[in-house]
């Protein structure tokens, strides 16, 4: 029987081997805060506080250091426990605009305090560059980065736990 999911990132493994970094709106003068840490539940916790001051309003983390060809798959499945807010699954490929990476994002809504597996089809991934929408197609054959962004224009604390990120058919 053919596998219907393929684990890309398993946060229950202590040896993740991925480069992870947080990028907040401070890159453009904002005051939002975000951080990532491993939990005792064997998950990654992405938490912080969104501030709308100084034209801010986002926090994100990015995972790089690996490349994925997911052309035989339909989308990404994430196993998360959230706070009821809407986040974005974000991917980068070789696609460029003005010499920097284009981001492809699809929004997903979390269920407060419940673990859920959410499936995001590649067809839902929309291109943008520094918040500006672009007319570009997402190519799942050349993914070089994955991550999560919170940019729901709501000030306040946030928390999202992630157990795994997989491809699904």
Stretch-by-stretch model annotation:
Residues 1-169:
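Beta-rich carbohydrate-recognition modules and glycan-binding surfaces
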């Amino acid at each position: 029987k053919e596998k219907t999911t393929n684990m890309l990132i398993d946060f229950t493994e202590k040896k993740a081997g991925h480069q992870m970094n947080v990028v907040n709106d401070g890159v453009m003068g904002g005051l939002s805060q975000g951080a990532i840490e491993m939990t005792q539940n064997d998950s990654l916790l992405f938490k912080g506080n969104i501030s709308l001051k100084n034209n801010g309003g986002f926090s994100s983390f990015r995972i790089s250091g690996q490349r994925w060809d997911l052309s035989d798959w339909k989308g990404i499945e994430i196993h998360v426990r959230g706070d009821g807010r809407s986040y974005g699954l974000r991917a980068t490929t070789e696609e460029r605009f003005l010499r920097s990476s284009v981001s492809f994002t699809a929004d997903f809504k979390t269920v407060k305090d419940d673990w859920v597996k959410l499936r995001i089809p590649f067809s839902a991934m929309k291109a943008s560059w520094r918040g500006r929408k672009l007319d570009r197609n997402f190519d799942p054959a050349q993914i070089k980065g994955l991550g999560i962004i919170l940019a729901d224009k709501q000030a306040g604390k946030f928390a999202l736990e992630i157990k795994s990120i997989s491809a699904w058919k």
